[in-house]
Amino acid sequence: MDWDQDRSNTELRKEKSRDAARSRRSQETEVLYQLAHTLPFARGVSAHLDKASIMRLTISYLRMHRLCAAGEWNQVEKGGEPLDACYLKALEGFVMVLTAEGDMAYLSENVSKHLGLSQLELIGHSIFDFIHPCDQEELQDALTPRPNLSKKKLEAPTERHFSLRMKSTLTSRGRTLNLKAATWKVLHCSGHMRAYKPPAQTSPAGSPRSEPPLQCLVLICEAIPHPASLEPPLGRGAFLSRHSLDMKFTYCDERIAEVAGYSPDDLIGCSAYEYIHALDSDAVSRSIHTLLSKGQAVTGQYRFLARTGGYLWTQTQATVVSGGRGPQSESIICVHFLISRVEETGVVLSLEQTEQHTRRPPRLSASSQKGIPGNSVDSPAPRILAFLHPPALSEASLAADPRRFCSPDLRRLMAPILDGPPPAATPSTPQATRRPQSPLPADLPDKLTVGLENAHRLSTAQKNKTVETDLDIAQDPDTLDLEMLAPYISMDDDFQLNSSEQLPKVHRRPPRVARRPRARSFHGLSPPIPEPSLLPRWGSDPRLNCSSPSRGDRPTASLMPGTRKRALAQSSEDKGLELLETKPPKRSPRLEPGSFLLPPLSLSFLLQGRQLPGNQQDPRAPLVHSHEPLGLAPSLLSLCQHEETVQPRNRFPPAAGLGQTH
């Protein structure tokens, strides 16, 4: 019994709760519909609004009411007619008011004609939900108040001009699509950033209460029409042109002859920037940048130069049109609207406005071409044009004096070949005869080789006279080929040698041998020397091959595997110096002293003790010490048996411990 009574009480409480909730919802609905009827909309429109839309539109209405109360709006005079309907007809776009947060506080009724979205669907929403994501940063910058950077002007700049891509449900045929299938439409927006101070209000305590000023952006948004939607008769105050992506004319309407005095053929291939006033080129460049990034753009009012002088105020609507696949098939269609007639007709602002200016080279008459060699080299046309089309001459006349048919730049480039190197006289070589300035092509390889050898001998003779033996005197950096030398990299931090280590002895060079250039880098290990049978080195001598002696050389003992490569490397360096008397193109790296040569040995020789570079070697010291490997002595003797009697040089300085004989 008790259980049934508790169950009935629970059901009664639930029913009362449901009735109370139903009553609250009905009262809420009634209040919201009463609120909807108070909004300035038609009764048929407000009756179909949902609760969220009613709240959204009410908040927007309250914002606009505060703006109207704070702003200085022009009131309709007594006896005058209201002009609100005329404003919408005169405007080519719609009016939009944005708050500082980006909410659309107001849009005019004709927004549906441009975007396909009704006024009620947009008011109260954030504009960032309807514009292209790439344009949100630009709009946010326009909504931000800009500081006043000028001391003369008390007010900060409030004017705004930008382009937006906004969602549109209209098709080219006038049909309306779903919002999910909307496309992007470019709108040119221009307006001002306004700050309205609301009227002062009193608090319940009686003290005045001030509110911050209301910031809003009032814009007029105009849709840029596509060129395909324009009617064929544009009128006398407009003309059409087509450009490539670099704004060069590819087509121009014939009406430009009546308006600006240009012929369409004169503009083909010319850039549009050449016919724009210099003071307006920056503003037009920004509009072209917007055009290439968004597909459509409207320029501001700029001055288009007339043919006979002066300019016309013009405004241009540009659209990027694609005729196929790829960027090469794209072009720019421009519709130019003339705002004024030609002003300041007597002022010449560009070369395009002069009659003497032409882009094509002048044609020469037949009589003037007969007596001029080289087809009008001395013609009044630019000199470089004479080399674009040389006359048809025989090869013999070209070979006799080819410099006549070369441009000045080509003459300077071919001067070493056409003029030849200067003759050099050495004691051992007779003076070379002077070569003609224009040799035949068949003689160029041999004579150029002789000239290069003479230049090498001359430079070697000059260097032999000024050889420096002091290690403290650095080589002049101007005489070095810095492009062929590696930068100096100190290796002291990478290889920590013992404190008892000493550098090898310094060897003086004979006066007749040219000083080797100092290397600027040292990598620790010398590069491996390839086998002579696989890669013969330039300047090497086959007599140094111990395995196959020739020319009466007596056979040497069998060498150790490691000593053969060192002997070949050393012989190639000595023999190359004796035969050429010049420096070879590449040398083994060495340390900073200019006369110290690092032999191509392994790292174990570097880690042994050496004497200081300042100490001179004893001429009576033996070439091979008793503690060196026995297989190394014959190879070293073979290096010196074909050399001339010069001061002996020790290429392989022994270690401090091995230099002491028993």
UniProtKB/Swiss-Prot annotation:
Compositional bias per record (Low complexity), positions renumbered to this chain: 426-437
Positions of region (Nuclear localization signal (isoform 2)): 75-98
Cross-linked residues, Glycyl lysine isopeptide (Lys-Gly) (interchain with G-Cter in ubiquitin): 463, 565
CDD domains: bHLH-PAS_HIF3a_PASD7, PAS
Domain of life of the native organism: Eukaryota
Summary of the knockout phenotype: Mice appeared outwardly normal and are viable and fertile. Show hypertrophy of the right atrium and ventricle, disarrangement of striated muscle fibers in the heart, and pulmonary hyperplasia.
The encoding gene: Hif3a
Compartment annotation: Nucleus; Cytoplasm
Domain bHLH span(s) in chain numbering: 12-65
PROSITE patterns assigned to the protein according to its UniProt record, in alphabetical order: BHLH, PAS
Key words, A-Z: Angiogenesis, Apoptosis, Cytoplasm, Developmental protein, Hydroxylation, Isopeptide bond, Mitochondrion, Nucleus, Repeat, Repressor, Stress response, Transcription, Transcription regulation, Tumor suppressor, Ubl conjugation
Protein induction: Isoform 2 is up-regulated in corneal epithelium cells under hypoxia (at protein level). Isoform 2 is up-regulated by hypoxia in a HIF1A-dependent manner. Isoform 3 is up-regulated by hypoxia.
GO CC, any one term: nuclear speck
Segments of this protein annotated with the region Nuclear export signal (isoform 2): 228-272
Biased composition (Basic and acidic residues): 572-584
The protein, known as: Hypoxia-inducible factor 3-alpha
InterPro entries the record matches: bHLH_dom, HIF_alpha-like, HLH_DNA-bd_sf, PAS, PAS-like_dom_sf, PAS_fold
